[in-house]
Every structure is written in C-alpha cells, then in structure tokens.
Amino acid sequence: MKILIDENMPYAAELFSGLGEVIAKSGRTLTADDLIDVDALMIRSVTKVNAELIEKANKLKFVGTATAGMDHVDQALLKEKGIFFTAAPGCNKVGVAEYVLSCLMVLAQQHGFSIFDKTFGIVGAGQVGSYLAQCLDALNISYLLNDPIKEQEGDSRSFVALDELLEKSDVITLHTPITRDGEYPTHHLIGQKTLSKLRNDQILINAARGPVVDNQALKQRLLKQDGFKAVLDVFEFEPDVDMELLPLLSFATPHIAGYGLEGKARGTTMIFNFYCEFLKRNERADPQTLLPIAPIPNVTLNQQWDHSTLHNLIQLVYDVRKDDAVFRKEIATVGAFDKMRKDYWDRREYSAITITGTQCCDLTPLQQLGFTIEEV
C-alpha cells in the first residue's frame, strides 16, 4: 500500500509508515504522475485536488487534508470517483485565534489603545470564529457575529447582518471559507464598496482565505493613509504577494496563523485516525504524545493579573512581529512563501505554558483562554 503525504505535514511520516509505504513530496507541485499506484493521499491546503491531478490515480481510495478548510478539494469529483474524503475540522482554531489576539495586543501597544475597549466583529462563526468568540468571552470583550448560513440553519446564537457588523465593530476579523456560488458567496466579500465605508479607526484582519478580501481594493484603501489598518495572513494570489500592498499592512505573514505545532499535530492525527477507521484498523494517535516539551518558561503569579500581565503572557507564547519581520525580509526571494511555511518554527499554543498562582489570583479567565493552570 502506497501513501503519498505532503512533506510539510509534521509527524505524518512516522505515523503513516506503520500502515504502508510512505512517499513524501511537495504538496504544491504534485502532478498526476505522482498519484499512479497511490492508495491514499494526505495533503494540506496548497494542493489542489481536481480532475487534472487525479486523472492517473488508478488505485486512489482515500484523500485526507490535514486542514480545516476544504475549498482546495473537488469533493463532488471524489465522490463521483468513489474516493473517500475527509478533513480535520477545527484542528487550527486555537492557533488562528491566538494569532488574532497577538496582532491586537501588539497594535494596542503600538497605538495606545486597549483591546478591552474595542468591539470585535467576527465574520464566520465556524470552528475558528466560535473559538475566538470563546476567548473574547473569557476576557469579557464585546463582539458581534455574522454568519448568515448558520443563522438560517437555526443556530441559537445572536447574529447581525454584515453591514451592521462593519458599522459597529472596531476590529473586523474574517474566518470564512472561500465560496463563489450560493446565496452568500465570500469571494471578495470585503471589496471596494465595503472598504470605502470602513472608518479610519477600524482594523481589518484576514486569517481565512486570501480571495475573501479584494487585495487591489484593499491597497487603494490603505493608500489613503488615514489610520485604517489591515493585517493579512493570507493573500489573494498566494504564493504571489503584491509588493506594493505589503508595506501598507500593519502585519503580514505567509498563511501561518493556524500553524502552531499543536494544531498541525491535531490535523495530522485526525486524518491518520480517519484513515485507520477507513482501513478498519485499531491504531489511533494522540497529538499530545507527539509534542516535544515547549521551550517556554513556566510562570508564577503572586498577585492578581492585569492587562499588562496578559499582554506579556500572550507575547511570551507568540509575538506576531517575529513572523512579520521574517516575511518582509524574505518574501522577495523566489519560492520564499512556501519555504517559510515549510521551515516554520515550532510555535506553541497557550497550553504550553503552565501558570502557577496563589489563591489571591483568579486564574479562571486565563484557563478559559487555554493556559495550563496550577494553583498552590
């Protein structure tokens, strides 16, 4: 049995090698010839699974993507061909939410505001958007939710229309899939018309899919230099990046918002476990058993934490400025976008820090954010 895996999928080689012959290749450059005699294909979001890719896949029975998003896979085609497909929903939700919080903490420090005084507008209330809302609840930060599809499906949460969210939010953070059809397409959801209405004190963050934001229109909006700010982790035509847009962004990163080591381990183990079920085998993997000890010091709190403490804790785990600096330095090099993703450092989640506190400290909000808590 041959199993073709994306070479950038951590822990995949060691897990899948127990099931068959593992072949590791670059996910972005896969061709139809690579799938000849392959039984299973394990990918990430850079691989487009379409008719061209699988035209010679004479033995393919299983495709798994170790990502939450699925827009890179022609699911109808796979179903038609009798090829089982699965994804890893929610695997990256913690990393993306922590990315957003890091961006806002740094911007707050740079521009002299408090995120606790801001209203967040979360566009897309799936796994990532819902987890971010959970984090904001823990910190008692107000937010609005927009997700017309979930609202139509009867989701009991309180939703608002997109126009209302854009008008009333200080921070607009996007967490939708990319869709071009249907009643609520998200392609260029944030386009020229929408961008022209945004206030100069608003912040836009796209850590979803690049084409959700019209990058050309965003560039024109930022050229006004009136205080409006934008953060992009994803780009409309990635791995190509508009080099005129880049200097206008507050932060820019190469599609790594959800690239925490825990999230990648969850994604890999989820599709490994799905594949074992598909094969009717008993093997199962636990991501926690794969993770190394985090090189992050534990923290002791002897008094009640405040906003400054929270800022320091968040930046101790992940400071977006590190990735932003590397991105700006390297992106002009040919192939840099994918290389930065391939060589991405072992970023950890809040759970990698253990916070020890005395009884005088209410650590519940920090625990709800994901930090590991020990009370003495």
Curated annotation (Swiss-Prot):
- Binding of substrate occurs at S45, T67, Y259
What does the record give as its pathway?
Answer: Cofactor biosynthesis; pyridoxine 5'-phosphate biosynthesis; pyridoxine 5'-phosphate from D-erythrose 4-phosphate: step 2/5
- Which branch of life, at top level? Bacteria
| InterPro entries on file | D-isomer_2-hydroxyacid_DH, D-isomer_2_OHA_DH_cat_dom, D-isomer_DH_CS, D-isomer_DH_NAD-bd, Erythronate-4-P_DHase, Erythronate-4-P_DHase_dimer, NAD(P)-bd_dom_sf, PdxB_dimer_sf
Where does the record place the catalytic residues? Answer: R209, E238, H255 (proton donor)
User: What EC number(s) has UniProt assigned to this enzyme?
Assistant: 1.1.1.290
Q: Which GO terms describe its biological process?
A: pyridoxine biosynthetic process
Under the heading Pfam families, the entry gives: 2-Hacid_dh, 2-Hacid_dh_C, DUF3410
Question: Which sites bind NAD(+)?
Answer: Q127, V128, D147, T176, D233, G258
Q: Which GO terms describe its molecular function?
A: 4-phosphoerythronate dehydrogenase activity; NAD binding; protein dimerization activity
GO CC, one annotated term: cytoplasm
Task: Please list the reactions this protein catalyses.
Answer: 4-phospho-D-erythronate + NAD(+) = (R)-3-hydroxy-2-oxo-4-phosphooxybutanoate + NADH + H(+)
Protein localization: Cytoplasm
Q: Which UniProt keywords apply?
A: Cytoplasm, NAD, Oxidoreductase, Pyridoxine biosynthesis
Q: Which family does it belong to?
A: Belongs to the D-isomer specific 2-hydroxyacid dehydrogenase family. PdxB subfamily.
Q: How does it assemble?
A: Homodimer.
Give a short account of what the protein does: Catalyzes the oxidation of erythronate-4-phosphate to 3-hydroxy-2-oxo-4-phosphonooxybutanoate.
Q: What is this protein called?
A: Erythronate-4-phosphate dehydrogenase
